[in-house]
Amino acid sequence: MNDTEGHVDILVCMAGTGGTGFGTASYLRSRNPNLQVVLVQPHPDSRLTPEHPDAQIIDGVLPAYDVPESTLSDYLWPDWSDACINVRTEEAYETAHEVLRAEGLFLGTSAAAALHAAVQVGRRPENQGKNIVVIVLDNGMKYLSTPMYRQK
């Protein structure tokens, strides 16, 4: 809150169990009732399904939109968010590599996916000048042996 002088217009967060996003959104909405919450979930191509049994997934992330209610956690209900962005695993990998090279930040897949979505949100003309906060929850350490950080 210090970095934004107490004002956040848009919160971008991943759909994991939903607890962090829900709690953060609840607090920020108490400060700004007009807060927009953008939930980020894996693109259908980046989910393990019978149609995609070998999909590279965004680790620790669950879809919240367009899925059976029985699969949602107690906090992962799409009604607390205003929009949803699907991110492909490859987009998360590309973002992680770009940020590592440019900024020296070593992101994991879910952090990179959230950042990828936040950049998309920030590029929209209607969001120019708005304070956008993104929650990044993982680093790249546990992904060193995965395709994400293997040498190309």
PLM regions with names:
Residues 1-5, 25, 97, 118-123:
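Generic structural signal for well-ordered alpha-helical scaffold segments
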Residues 1-36:
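Glycine-rich ThDP/TPP pyrophosphate-binding loop and its adjacent helix/strand module
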Residues 13-15, 39-41, 133-138:
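Short beta-strand segments
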Residues 14-25, 110-118, 143:
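Short glycine/serine/threonine-rich phosphate/pyrophosphate-binding segments
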Residues 14-17, 21, 58, 102, ...:
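Short glycine/serine/threonine-biased micro-segments
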Residues 30-109, 147-152:
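Active-site/ligand-binding loops adjacent to catalytic centers
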